[in-house]
């Protein structure tokens, strides 16, 4: 272009973007953690390893700023939902939740029933390598991610959240309801997992886990999950007020 020198072009290229203008551009998220872990990769892995146990993972919360945050896990084969209470929703806290689950179950039982973790692409689950690595620095699980905006790909867990919400409704102050610690969450889990499920032949997830996966049941029972008699199961917000 006439009148523009090479020096002018160099100045233009090297000139920094103003802070005001830079704010208009969203930093591109690092998606390297998805490599080999997409839903397509998950389907391929399941196709080659049809007998491995799958656990679906997510977070449930009402107040994104103040929490509390519930890290949920559903053991697909037994239909049982487990959960860990957090005060923050970060990649580090979710990794610590998996560390705790491994500690509760023990390495052998964990690696058996949490062979695969299927979750969504929320930023709190982006530390794939850390989540996959056990406290002994060896692989403890394989993490895979649903496609964007496809929560139905882990619909089994999403459906269980509906039952969780009977006790912990959206829009409520969860701490005011009584969800103040893990013991309170264990009470919620005990009731949800003691409710009979049609797909399980009228048995509860805890019944099925006890009968078919007793090693898993023993670990969860020792942590604080207990069977509730069917006529005493409460799936209402007043449960923790009792």
Identify the residue ranges that each predicted region occupies:
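Secondary-structure boundary/capping micro-motif
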Residues: 1-176, 180-190, 195-197, 205-242
